[in-house]
Amino acid sequence: MSGTPEVISLGCRLNIAESERMRAMMAGERDLVVVNSCAVTREAVRQTRQAIRRARRANPSARLLVTGCAAETEREAIAAMPEVDGLVANAAKLDPRAWNLPETAPPAPKQRTRAFVAIQNGCDHACTFCIIPQGRGPSHSLPIKDVLREVESHLEQGAPEIV
């Protein structure tokens, strides 16, 4: 494996954006595979398990960690998989301390067409049909200074569009 960790992203655009940030944060880490999971449907959970097994076969000696919504909603089942070396809480996945990394801010990942800035995450509603609150937790917003810092970083990297 190279010095760039493999981050496998399943699910929504927010997961894709978070995966890019994790990849930038973990630059230089070797022999690491992260599965950023989804749990929005039963099929998404099945695909998460499949991605975990596939990642282990492709990287038998790498440390394989799982984060994301399925790592929250299916915590016991995912942790019991023999392929999995550990779980990182969804709420902590962008915190370098959760990965035993230095707390310096990572550079914004380079984007080809658009950069993503998540300003709100989670949900305070308890709709019977939705698993988002269990996977992402209660609603919380990024402080405006952090939003501006992230936008500035993307602009410095040459992002032509910010979503």
Where are these regions (language model features)?
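Proteins enriched for Cys/Gly/acidic motifs involved in redox and nucleic-acid/cofactor modification
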Residues: 1-163
